[in-house]
Amino acid sequence: MLEINDLKKTFDNSSPALKGVNLKINKGEFVSILGPSGSGKTTLLRIINGLETSSEGEIYFDNLKVNNSTIPEIQKKTGMIFQEFNLVNNLSAINNVLTGLLNTSSKFLSLFYLFKKNQKI
């Protein structure tokens, strides 16, 4: 479950990129975040994933308050695909995807060991 309470993010004392964001997503729900360019979608996702800090408000993930000490645990259960990204040139597509799982012990990761080394996915 993800719960966001009165989230606000301001950059450089300017107008807030996010203001008064409240959201609750229950386990198993699928949610889309839609809006025009510059409306704060990416900022919201970056805050949820611990890549940015909020100016105000609280976020809970699986009833765990998101803060500097809980971010590593939360990042084991979440992921983010960035709008702008760079591939590691000498890695295959699957290895580029798996680089985000380097510090996890996920059952998902174990699925990739079912494939033989030279088998294409």
Question: What residue ranges belong to the model's regions?
Answer:
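Helix-to-loop junction immediately C-terminal to a conserved catalytic motif
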Residues: 49
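Short coil-to-beta microelement around the adenine-binding A-loop and adjacent beta1/P-loop entry
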Residues: 14-16, 72
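Short coil-to-helix segment of the ABC ATPase nucleotide-binding domain corresponding to the Q-loop/switch region
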Residues: 91-105
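ABC ATPase nucleotide-binding domain signature
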Residues: 78, 82-86, 91
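ABC nucleotide-binding domain "signature motif"
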Residues: 55-66
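ABC ATPase NBD coupling module
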Residues: 65-79, 112-117
